[in-house]
């Protein structure tokens, strides 16, 4: 059984027991979270596709960890001007473990 849900402007395909990385959620580590923006649920040959969401289906997950991703360097360089600008960015993320699809 698997499902597709939306979180943080992105769509994720998950199954029970899977750990995924999402955009940062303001929920403490160890807490549970429910996602109700379920776009599709498949159980064998039984497939339900929402328009836009499947009614009555929720995905339950447990927050495992919070952190920051790898650093991305942004460089702006102007040739022959002796001008250079550097900037870095590290995106916050939340790791969640899917505990149930109901």
Curated annotation (Swiss-Prot):
Q: Does the keyword RNA-binding apply?
A: yes
Transmembrane stretches in the record are none
Covalent S-S links between cysteines: none
A single GO cellular-component term from the record reads: ribonucleoprotein complex
Q: List the PROSITE patterns.
A: RIBOSOMAL_L21 (PS01169)
Q: Name one GO molecular function term.
A: structural constituent of ribosome
Pfam assignment, any one: Ribosomal_L21p
- Family matches, as InterPro entries: bL21-like, bL21-like_sf, Ribosomal_bL21, Ribosomal_bL21_CS
List keywords of the entry alphabetically: Ribonucleoprotein, Ribosomal protein, RNA-binding, rRNA-binding
For biological process, the GO terms are:
translation
PANTHER family registered for this protein in UniProt? 50S RIBOSOMAL PROTEIN L21, LARGE RIBOSOMAL SUBUNIT PROTEIN BL21M
What function is annotated for this protein? This protein binds to 23S rRNA in the presence of protein L20.
Q: Which HAMAP family match?
A: Ribosomal_bL21 (MF_01363)
Give the family from UniProt. Belongs to the bacterial ribosomal protein bL21 family.
Q: How does it assemble?
A: Part of the 50S ribosomal subunit. Contacts protein L20.
Q: How is this protein named in the record?
A: Large ribosomal subunit protein bL21
Q: Which gene encodes it?
A: rplU
């Amino acid at each position: 059984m698997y499902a597709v849900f939306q979180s943080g402007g992105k769509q994720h395909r998950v199954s029970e027991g899977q750990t995924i990385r999402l955009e940062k959620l303001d929920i403490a580590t160890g807490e549970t979270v429910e996602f109700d923006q379920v776009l599709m649920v498949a159980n064998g040959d039984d497939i339900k596709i929402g328009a836009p969401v499947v009614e009555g289906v929720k995905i339950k997950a447990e927050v495992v960890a919070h952190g920051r991703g790898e650093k991305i360097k942004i460089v702006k360089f102007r040739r022959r001007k002796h001008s250079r600008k550097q900037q870095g960015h590290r995106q916050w993320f939340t790791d969640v473990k899917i505990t149930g699809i109901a």
